[in-house]
Amino acid sequence: GAMDIIQPDTCAAGGLTECRKIADMAAAFGVRYNPHVWGTGIGLAASLQLMAVLPPHTPPSLAPADPVFEFDRTEHPIRQAILSEPIEHARGVIRIPDGPGLGIEIDRAALERFRA
């Protein structure tokens, strides 16, 4: 095929429903789906929730591959600050937030600080 991996951004490619359709189409053609994640903790949480419901990618070798998730570590003052509990990784593992909705709670005071 023309590609082995696709990386749509959940927040820019139509949201959770559209990206699920993209992931299903990718799986039908044996293409790995890894979301591109850039922006705030809200987008990070959305992409994590999407990845949590996708079946494991099984490449042509028929050995299921562990999920790969882009986790940006560049300085970004807003990304984690707007979450009451930041999403972090430890030893290459990210805990998926398990609260209602996306699993996160927005820090409204932080939103006020960053409001233009």
Question: Language model features by range: what are they?
Answer:
Residues 1-93:
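Shared catalytic-loop signature of beta/alpha-barrel
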Residues 77-116:
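C-terminal extensions of enzymes
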